[in-house]
């Protein structure tokens, strides 16, 4: 563990000119370029050819989270504009229940122009579903760099989900350096997004179209879904010299029992679409270790801590860990596992479940680049040097890669 903790983030830097960051997506999602890294060799293709590089019987896992319109703008009587960015629900802390509220919802929020919001509530008049209402935001206690914010409204026929849909703005990554456009509402969601909760898209999935999904099924792959709600922490740069000083953000995950049964039963490789699916799948192993050690743990106690994989724990096989988790779900009569993960995957980590990965090109000095480096056993430079030399587009709206170490 000590070696991993002392990794210098400066060793994971590379020059990324601004013009290589894709500010907008391509007109057709699946026309993006695909870099294929296979056992150390690099080639390039187009995303529509992805099925050609995969095998029948493989299990492909997607993150079906949906980005919410999490940015709310209020104007004070003084004229000052305050932005409230909803990060995660506090009261109720269950996403579905929070979105269903009809009078009050509390969220952990980042507040823009905080110095202009010293005290008192903010108000916004609006019409939702033809119904007039006043939304009030009241700032509570400071929680680290974020704040507790209570939202109340005076029309019980309107849910908090309705309010976000009408009043909220889709949050796009800060490095795009532009305003959100109407087209982002469609292009910054995957075609299979279902479960509301993310404040950033699982961007590896943005390339998939119905025709690519159909081609994968025709090839004989089994497609399954998990949910990880992507937090704003995904954009937080590593500011410490060594990664030991970087605190990973907690993200909420949901996995159906059927998916865990599939992971246990299938004989082919597991292909993860995106780093969020990777983090969810790899977390399942450590959740299985916890259920092995604490058979009656609550779902909250199954939370995967940042450094847990690097600490001493029973050396279960992947099958043993997944079976332990499945037994736990059967004992507790759970159809779906709801917990959270803070896992950091960096060089020194041994992958337990994921054998192939579809992912975009990530920011320099980011934890996502560490995750990729751990997967390709340090050979990330080969991939990124090729992508830079061959006009690949980078970051959220950029091109894609298939990694087969």
Regions found by a protein language model. Name each.
Residues 1-405:
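Surface-exposed, charge/polar-rich loops and edge strands
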């Amino acid at each position: 563990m000590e070696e991993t903790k002392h990794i210098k983030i400066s060793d994971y830097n590379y020059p990324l000119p601004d013009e290589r960051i894709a500010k907008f997506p391509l007109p057709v999602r699946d026309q993006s370029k695909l870099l294929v890294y296979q056992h150390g060799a690099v080639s390039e293709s187009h995303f529509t050819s992805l099925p050609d590089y995969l095998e029948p019987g493989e299990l492909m896992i997607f993150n079906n989270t949906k980005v919410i319109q999490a940015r709310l703008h209020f104007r004070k009587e003084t004229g000052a504009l305050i932005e409230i960015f909803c990060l995660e629900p506090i009261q109720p802390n269950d996403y579905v229940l929070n979105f269903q509220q009809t009078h009050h919802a509390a969220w952990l929020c980042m507040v823009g122009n905080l110095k202009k919001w010293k005290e008192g509530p903010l108000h916004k008049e609006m019409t939702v579903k033809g119904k007039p209402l006043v939304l009030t935001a009241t700032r509570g206690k400071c929680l680290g760099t974020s704040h507790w914010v209570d939202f109340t409204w005076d029309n019980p026929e309107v849910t908090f989900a309705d309010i976000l849909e009408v009043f909220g703005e889709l949050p796009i990554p800060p490095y795009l350096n532009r305003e959100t456009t109407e087209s982002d509402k469609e292009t910054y969601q995957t075609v299979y997004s279902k479960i509301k909760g993310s404040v950033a898209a699982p961007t590896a999935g943005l390339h998939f179209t119905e025709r690519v999904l159909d081609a994968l099924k025709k090839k004989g792959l089994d497609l399954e879904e998990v949910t990880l709600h992507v937090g704003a922490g995904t954009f937080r740069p590593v500011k410490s010299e060594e990664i030991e000083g970087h605190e990973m953000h907690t993200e909420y995950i949901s996995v159906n029992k059927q998916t865990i049964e599939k992971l246990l039963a299938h004989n082919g490789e597991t292909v993860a679409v995106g780093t969020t699916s990777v983090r969810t799948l790899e977390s399942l192993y450590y959740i299985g270790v916890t259920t092995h050690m604490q058979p009656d743990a609550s779902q909250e106690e199954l939370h995967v801590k940042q450094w847990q994989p690097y600490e001493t724990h029973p050396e279960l096989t992947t099958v043993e860990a997944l079976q332990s988790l499945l037994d736990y779900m059967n004992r507790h009569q759970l159809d779906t596992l709801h917990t959270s993960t803070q896992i950091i995957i960096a060089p020194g980590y041994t992958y337990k479940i994921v054998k192939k990965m579809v992912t975009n090109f990530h920011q320099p000095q980011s934890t996502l680049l560490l995750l990729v480096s751990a997967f390709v056993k340090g050979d990330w430079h080969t991939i990124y040097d090729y992508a830079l030399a061959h006009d690949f587009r980078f970051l959220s709206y950029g091109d894609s890669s298939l990694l087969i170490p």
